[in-house]
Amino acid sequence: MAMNPLTVPSLPRLSGIGDIETRVILKKLARAHQALAELKGVAASMPNQSILVSTLSLQEAKDSSEIENIITTHDDLYRSDSASHHFVTLAAKEVHNYAVALRVGFEKVKRTGLLTLNDILEIQAGIEENRAGFRKLPGTALKNDKTGETVYTPPQHEGDITALMADLERFINEPGDCDWDPLTKMAVIHHQFESIHPFYDGNGRTGRVVNILYLVQQGLLDTPVLYLSRYINQHKADYYRLLQTVRETGEWEAWLLFMLEGVEQTAGQTTALVVDIKAQMQQVKHRLRSELPKIYSQDLINNLFRHPYTKIEFVASELQVTRQTAARYLDEVVALGLLSKHKRGKENFYLNDALFARLANVNSRRDEA
């Protein structure tokens, strides 16, 4: 029976949903797992995976924030610096907040093996820079941006929200609850989180962080490098339509296929991106070692790929050299043609042009190259 969006829905406990892994879903799961396994293997072959966490988490943050109409350019994003609290625009600041929350959540999940309500609360607090916690007051309704029509009313009462989130926490962390594939569970977890809509703000971005961290918790990824938000952003209308279809009909197949297609597509795109970044690092390593042996170091190479826009203070800090030495290193790399130098105000930025161009075009896959 179709639900009236103006009435408060009674969301199901997750253990009571039933068997939703149809034959079509099982076939799609196999393809999605193959793509994820390839991405995991390629990422593990990187000599320093922290480079991927730093660089690709910003890319994911940008795409996830665009779903919420928080738009920033790659230029503003990479010229901003969350460590020094310098942000070119407010949008860049919000994107950096997301990336930091993702990295902090990743470190916690890797350390504990759990993804708890406290972790989710911390992620949302980092994204929104407030500690309002779960909703305590009624009145939240999701509306069509264009018409203003209410399309969905999530649970309104604090007790219901708390109970549903506790149920979600158990579902995430206790594998004995059901024998679904982890990717099926990820799609169901995401749907349930979006439907509970537990926060006043930041639900979408927090939910997409939970997606990535759940894949890490389940061992499907070692690092949070899957570009699922880009796929959702490209198919935003279908995303919201299918979320609502499950709420109204209880039919899961189309939603699961949508999310699994997203995993398969974005895993392939991200695999191609990681392969290209690794190849670029090897090329830079060869050039520096052969043409600038006096300044060559793996730490310098790591810096140039951790920060698409690097700065003198980044190099000085990470290589433990003086600012004067760091400036000389960067100018020599510029002279070699591996970086371009840009002055903004009183500050110089050094752009890794090849990396920047590749990050701005993550849609390509290796089989399309």
Model-derived features with residue positions:
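FIC/Doc superfamily catalytic core
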Residues: 1-369
